[in-house]
Amino acid sequence: MLKVKVKKLLSYRGYYGNIKYSPVDRVLYGKVIRLPKTFISYEGNSLAELEQDFHNAIDAYIELCEEDGEKPKKSNLNDYN
């Protein structure tokens, strides 16, 4: 599977996610970066869909943490290259 890397980050509510493209699947996808012990992914057929799914994933993560009485972790970009 050929993958193309794009040097761009999405940002929302203190969370950051990468953007990747799969030409085989013809879909944009990514995951929230620098979030300890937590995996959040998202995808879309366009940049608008990708960004909306990213926002929805972050909102769902925060809501789940609140329901469980936990403080949501934030992305840490202090040493991100």
For each feature predicted by the language model, list its residue ranges.
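Short glycine-enriched loop/turn motifs at secondary-structure junctions
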Residues: 33-37
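Short, charged, surface-exposed hinge/linker loops at domain edges
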Residues: 1-18, 25, 38, 48, ...
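Short beta-strand motif preference
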Residues: 28-31
